[in-house]
Amino acid sequence: MIVIKPNKEMKKILLTLITLTLTAVSCLAQNEAGTWTLTPKVGLNFARMTNPDIYIDMGDEKIEYTYKPALTAGVETEYQLNSHIGLAAELLYSNQGYTLKDNSAFRNGKATVHYLNLPLTAKFYFAPNLAFRVGLQPGFALGRHIEEDENDGNGQWTHHSSSDTWFRRFDLSLPLGLSYNIGAFEVDARYNLGLNNITDVDVVKIHNRVLQITIGYRFAMN
């Protein structure tokens, strides 16, 4: 059995590498004023839409949307104003929409809207490495698709699928959440509250609701 014993030079090199690594991680965690970070990230959406006024056949059975799990991914850049406040801008692909709870009129219903979102948020560090974030998020629908099985009233179900949907292309949301830095990693959880009506249907108003959880790796840019 061959055993390699580190000599003094190897020990110095190893100690230097450990020191440099810890220093880099420490610098990222300390939120020094005037620094920039770039954070690629990926995560999961739990998306749905609100529709408080839609009922089936004018009766008492209400159409209910449930949360749809889907992918989100993108990149964030953050400028640190001081040790307590950072300004962040993101470019995120976000798969949103809803799944429809089965009822007497529809089943297997779901909608998919592919958004390009641009969240602009302020991050308030109220504890070491822990920040509350709030801002505005304009979003632009790149693709829209809806499908469902519809009951014709006689017990027969017909499948419908269409990309010509009633979703508007622009969405504006209010992101509220928490970010936590673990060394160079950032875990982010936020709730995107849709502010504008995203449907062209005159009789109802529908808004996006998205719970979003991501993990990213922060790179120091200066």
Give each language-model segment a name.
Residues 30-78, 194, 220-222:
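Short glycine/proline- and aromatic-enriched beta-strand/turn motifs that initiate or cap beta-hairpins
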Residues 86-132:
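Hydrophobic, well-structured mid-protein blocks that either form specific transmembrane helices
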Residues 1-37, 41, 215-221:
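Bacterial Sec-dependent N-terminal signal peptides
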Residues 31-33, 82-84, 127, 183-185, ...:
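Outer-membrane beta-barrel channels and translocator barrels
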Residues 49-65, 95-114, 142-168, 197-204:
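Flexible, solvent-exposed loop segments that connect beta-strands
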Residues 90, 96, 159-222:
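Predominantly the C-terminal beta-signal and adjacent terminal strand-loop region
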Residues 40-44, 71-79, 91-93, 118-126, ...:
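Residues on the lipid-exposed face of transmembrane beta-strands in outer-membrane beta-barrel proteins
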Residues 34-38, 67-71, 112-116, 168-174, ...:
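Residues that define the transmembrane beta-barrel architecture of outer-membrane proteins
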